[in-house]
C-alpha cells in the first residue's frame, strides 16, 4: 500500500514538472501579473490608511 502511494506521488510530481516545463514561457506573464496585482493591493491599503 505504501509503495502504491509513493508511486502515485511520484507520478504526480513528474506530471507537474512536465506541465511546468511545457508552460515555462507563460510563467513570466503570470509572475508579472502577480506583481502588478500585489502593487495594486498595496496602493489600495495605503489609500485606505490615509483616509
UniProtKB/Swiss-Prot annotation:
Annotated effect of mutating residue 36 to R: Decreased proteolysis of His3-(20-43)-peptide by C.albicans SAP2 and SAP9. Increased antifungal activity of His3-(20-43)-peptide against C.albicans
Signal peptide coordinates: 1-19
Region annotated Disordered, chain positions: 27-51
Coiled-coil residues: none
Function of the protein: Histatins are cationic and histidine-rich peptides mainly found in the saliva of higher primates. They are considered to be major precursors of the protective proteinaceous structure on tooth surfaces (enamel pellicle). Hsts can be divided into two major groups according to their biological functions: antimicrobial Hsts (e.g. Hst 5/HTN3) and cell-activating Hsts (e.g. Hst 1/HTN1, Hst 2/HTN1 and Hst 3/HTN3).
Other information: The recommended nomenclature of salivary peptides follows published guidelines. In agreement with the authors, it has been decided to indicate the boundaries of the peptides according to the positions within the precursor, and not in the mature protein, as has formerly been proposed.
Stated name of the protein: Histatin-3
Species of origin: Homo sapiens (Human)
Amino acid at each position: 500500500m505504501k509503495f502504491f502511494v509513493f508511486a502515485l506521488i511520484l507520478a504526480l510530481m513528474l506530471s507537474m514538472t512536465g506541465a511546468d516545463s511545457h508552460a515555462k514561457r507563460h510563467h513570466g506573464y503570470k509572475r508579472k501579473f502577480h506583481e502588478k496585482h500585489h502593487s495594486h493591493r498595496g496602493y489600495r491599503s495605503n489609500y485606505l490608511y490615509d483616509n
